[in-house]
Amino acid sequence: MISEERLLKILLSPHVSEKTSISMEKFNTVVLKVLNNATKYEIKYAVKKIFDVDVDSIKTLKVKGKKKRQSNRIIQRSHWKKAYIKVKKGCNLDFIGNTE
């Protein structure tokens, strides 16, 4: 069993881009930024508990931080983890709040 405190820390924010909005409409998939050390089981459990939806599948990947240049220094941004969460048909997990 996962503690309530850990559940609330696993899901960081929705990842909104052109690609994610298309996948949300076509494939009923939501993309979230999650903790680097979160497992698929923890992510699935957190989504079920917090949003009360049925999860069909989860795919995760780690995104490497970009190197940015500031004057004469090179700074690397933090690495982060992204989760593609496919929600079962009939369930809706909409962060943007489209009213149609």
UniProtKB/Swiss-Prot annotation:
Q: Which UniProt keywords apply?
A: Ribonucleoprotein, Ribosomal protein, RNA-binding, rRNA-binding
Q: Which GO terms describe its molecular function?
A: rRNA binding; structural constituent of ribosome
Q: Some GO term, biological process aspect, for this entry: which one?
A: translation
- Residues in the signal sequence: none
List the record's Gene Ontology CC terms alphabetically: ribonucleoprotein complex; ribosome
Tagged with keyword Transcription regulation = no
Q: What does this protein do?
A: One of the early assembly proteins it binds 23S rRNA. One of the proteins that surrounds the polypeptide exit tunnel on the outside of the ribosome. Forms the main docking site for trigger factor binding to the ribosome.
* Self-association and partners: Part of the 50S ribosomal subunit. Contacts protein L29, and trigger factor when it is bound to the ribosome.
Q: Which family does it belong to?
A: Belongs to the universal ribosomal protein uL23 family.
How is this protein named in the record?
Large ribosomal subunit protein uL23
Annotated source species:
Buchnera aphidicola subsp. Acyrthosiphon pisum (strain APS) (Acyrthosiphon pisum symbiotic bacterium)
